Curated annotation (Swiss-Prot):
The active site is at residues 78, 145. The keyword Hydrolase applies. PANTHER family: CYTOSOL NON-SPECIFIC DIPEPTIDASE. Optimum temperature is 37 degrees Celsius. Zn(2+) 2 binds at residues 76, 115, 169. The gene is pepD. Inhibited by metal chelators. Optimum pH is 9. Zn(2+) 1 binds at residues 115, 146, 457. This is Cytosol non-specific dipeptidase. Disruption phenotype: A quadruple peptidase disruption (pepA, pepB, pepD and pepN) does not grow in M9 minimal medium, grows better when supplemented with casamino acids. Its EC number is 3.4.13.18. Dipeptidase with broad substrate specificity. Requires dipeptide substrates with an unblocked N-terminus and the amino group in the alpha or beta position. Non-protein amino acids and proline are not accepted in the C-terminal position, whereas some dipeptide amides and formyl amino acids are hydrolyzed. Also shows cysteinylglycinase activity, which is sufficient for E.coli to utilize cysteinylglycine as a cysteine source.
Amino acid sequence: MSELSQLSPQPLWDIFAKICSIPHPSYHEEQLAEYIVGWAKEKGFHVERDQVGNILIRKPATAGMENRKPVVLQAHLDMVPQKNNDTVHDFTKDPIQPYIDGEWVKARGTTLGADNGIGMASALAVLADENVVHGPLEVLLTMTEEAGMDGAFGLQGNWLQADILINTDSEEEGEIYMGCAGGIDFTSNLHLDREAVPAGFETFKLTLKGLKGGHSGGEIHVGLGNANKLLVRFLAGHAEELDLRLIDFNGGTLRNAIPREAFATIAVAADKVDVLKSLVNTYQEILKNELAEKEKNLALLLDSVANDKAALIAKSRDTFIRLLNATPNGVIRNSDVAKGVVETSLNVGVVTMTDNNVEIHCLIRSLIDSGKDYVVSMLDSLGKLAGAKTEAKGAYPGWQPDANSPVMHLVRETYQRLFNKTPNIQIIHAGLECGLFKKPYPEMDMVSIGPTITGPHSPDEQVHIESVGHYWTLLTELLKEIPAK
């Protein structure tokens, strides 16, 4: 039995513990999907899958609720696979190890997958709990949301029967989400030429580590360090001065996670090693001063390494460094309409260098299409100046807020009655699948709720136990209050 079984509501936590035990990173959700299909069939529910693998489970209304508007509870099957550098974990094979730490549930050295595992568990717990009162009910579990919203893109019209969709992918209890940002991936690929490292040069690995990382939408406004940007800043400041040879540069693992670590392999002449060490120490102190409140565990390490690879020629080195150093990152503009909400942002998520190419992979988010288009244009111009090949792809729409949404008003009234306080109505600067659902289901009334999750998309991810109880109370009470057709 899982340690989580002592928590309330127990059915939800037991299901979440089971979800944690089955590997389900993006593109590897099939084992979990098969388990859920079998679980639902065993309980006698109607189950279907579509051509992209989405799961739809139907349950009839409880007695006396047959005339209520049908509702679909929606979550995504995949989780973001992030781990600490010293954690040995294969996300495709190893279970997540959740544990209780005071008021929170965390995972040992990895992302927890509360995003969106708690939402998924809550939907399945509603199906399983015979004490929950509800009208005609569907549960929709989508594929590969975190890596490209594949399931939402593939969702066909005339499959769902519901009039109301409750998305469970929000991460702040007491807040009701009625809109979200859209996004687009942007890559710049730069050709590299190499030459042998001169004799008498010593090779080092420069590592920037210890950053918090996090969700590139929900936490982009916080001002956390971006490992790719911070490491290239050092190279931009000192490459020519040190006659530095750049052999390798890699940073970040996911375009939708703020990168926590970046690595550069460099070589300098033996008589400049002491200068390099001094500059590294000085730069580390500069960063610790600048990010003293946000990144207390930041570390910049310089380690001597063996090397048999060629280095970039000076032109390739300088072009790459200048391109990455000049690439914007973070908040581009705050919204004039939604106060306190980021309108447009950019995350320089992944930098991958091979022998003759380097790819810079960014994720652009915006509440408005024109904001997204502007950043694409800016990055395209920058890439072309550097001679890089650029591509924008994988665009997904935002979810336009509807101030007159009946379900949003119902959630607000229900929350206020249950907890004697007014919830915040919010637009989130992150991608929810609701925007894509609006295309095949334009008349669907939608809202997004969830418990408090901090540090999503990072090994610091944790979910607040009490908030899960509040979220469950709200969700189950809301299902009782859904109006008649």
